[in-house]
Amino acid sequence: MRAPEAAMVATGGGGPGLFTNSKPGDRKIVPDDVGDREVFKVVYVVLESQYQASLSTACKRINAGQPDVAVECSGYILEELRDEANFQQFKKDVEEANIFIGSLIFVQELADKVVSVVEPNRDRLSAVCVFPSMPAVMKLNKIGSFTMVRRAPR
């Protein structure tokens, strides 16, 4: 199986993502020919580049085959958030997003960065879906009426 773009799998030291030479902008998906479709924006943070491939494929399939909706998607490999320019772009993307997805965020300093950006936007976001990650990041989950935030008893 071949990867369609070398930047998606290139590895090496010292690049913008520490473990990858790709940039978040290289993975951004913007739908062509939106027409009358409703566009929603998704931002995700995953541990490694292979995890982002399925999210990118899903977005492309939605954009190609759904008559009523289209997806704009911005993706980040967790380690890319160490780079200040990437982190600032991540903040901007989350501020404009409808949905945030996070997976395998287990590095404390990076988990803290994700929380610092997503938490202030949580109530505005339509959904926040985080799975196996640090507890503070898991508490951001919000899908419909489901939330992992503990409410004070009445």
Where are each of the predicted segments found?
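An N-terminal assembly and electron-transfer interface module characteristic of large anaerobic redox
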Residues: 2-154
